[in-house]
Amino acid sequence: MNLILASGSPRRKELLSLYTTDFTICVSDFDESGVTAPTPAQLVEKLARGKCLAVAKDHPGAVVLGCDTVVDVGGEVFGKPHSVEDAKRMLHALSGATHEVHTGVCVSDGVRTESFVDSCKVTFFPISEGEIDAYTATKEPYDKAGAYAIQGRAALWLDQLEGDYYTIMGLPVSRTALLLSRF
C-alpha cells in the first residue's frame, strides 16, 4: 500500500507509526477557513475529509489518511490558539470542567472514501492562574486544539477520561488501523 499521511503533526506521525512505518507525509493545503457544520463532530469530519481529498487528488493510486481534531466546550469549537491570550481563554474555559474532543479521520484511495469521528470526554481539575501563566509561557499549547497536550504537562490536570486517549492526541489508533485494513 502506498500510504500518505496528509498531516504535518508529529503526534499523528508517531501514532501512525504504531500501525506501520511505511508511509510518506504530504501536508494538505486544504483551506479550512470557510468550512462550517451544524455540530463540532460534523465539522471535524468535514475538515478531515477536505484535507484527505485535497492530497488524494494529486496522488492517484495512493491511500491517503487525513485527520483533524477539535475541542468542543458546550458546542463552542476550540482549535489551535492564535495567541497567548487565546490560549489562556481556552484553558480558563477548560479548568474544572468537562469538554469533548472530536477527531475526524478520513481515508481515500481515489475511488472509495470512508470517514469516521471518534469522540472522548475529558474532565480537568481546576487549573490555577499560575499554572495557566506558566503553561502558556511554553511552546506546548500553540499547535494543539484546545491549547493543551494531554501527553505533556496538561496530563497533570486530567481528572477523568471517557474514551480513547489517542483521540485526544489526534489519531484514534485502533479505529484508524481497522479502517486502513479495508484499503
Where do the PLM segments sit?
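Short linear Ser/Thr-Pro motifs
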Residues: 7-9, 28, 95
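A short beta-strand-loop structural module common to alpha/beta enzyme folds
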Residues: 24-33
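Short, glycine/serine-rich, charged loops/turns that create anion-binding
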Residues: 10, 30, 173
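Anionic-ligand binding patches
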Residues: 2-4, 37-183
